[in-house]
Amino acid sequence: MCIRDSSYIEAATNKGYNVLLMDGQLDIAVVSMLEQKFEKVRFTRVDSDIIDNLIVKEDKKNEALEAGKQEVLSSIFKSQLPKMDKTEFNITAQALGENATPIMITQSEYMRRMKEMANIQAGMSFYGEMPDMFNLVLNSDHKLVKEVLADEDKECAAAVAPVQAEMDEVNKQRTDLKKKQEGKKDEDIPTAEKDKVNELDKKWDELKTQKEGIFADYAAKNKVVRQLIDLALLQNGMLKGEALNNFVKRSIDLIK
């Protein structure tokens, strides 16, 4: 059992769930067979999702962070994620409780099964070639994540405001034009209008990149952001080499 396993297992057992240790080469095939035999039984790894989503419930809580803050957190943390070969991260923020971990990494049960089956079953090599997809989940209830949001607002608001205002205006013009074109055939839309929409799309993309650059510059100076990312990577055995050495140095600096 590794650090990654033990922390997720502890969270599941604390929730009252029964956890099976299945780390053999044939276990994925056994699990699939059992799920086919017992239609109402489903197996899922303890690190495939946040603890509240492991077992599907009808009374699921819905405390999503507002879209604007979701975007800010995503831009900040995405800018500081290390580049890894054939590895991609999707960043989300969810209310997990103030006592839960501030950040965690999960990986879809479905994709992991497909990639594992690709290693032992002919005809599924397509899944084996796909990049590993991970979810970086930020706990919006945690003090550290709240502090990052508050500090970002203080440091970036003045620079972001004019860019966002221009983005809103560009988006309004784009929406108005597309609404005007609704119901028309492509050949009936004047070339000038098509060019204008393309121009607005390009302008919006440029402004979005500019705004993300502001968040990236802020994130690069915030040691807590990178520390949280590295803690999540370390927990999942994904922090190695120079990145691990930098994490150790930063940890020492933070506790001096």
Located regions from the model:
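Long, intrinsically disordered, charge-dense linkers/tails
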Residues: M1-K256
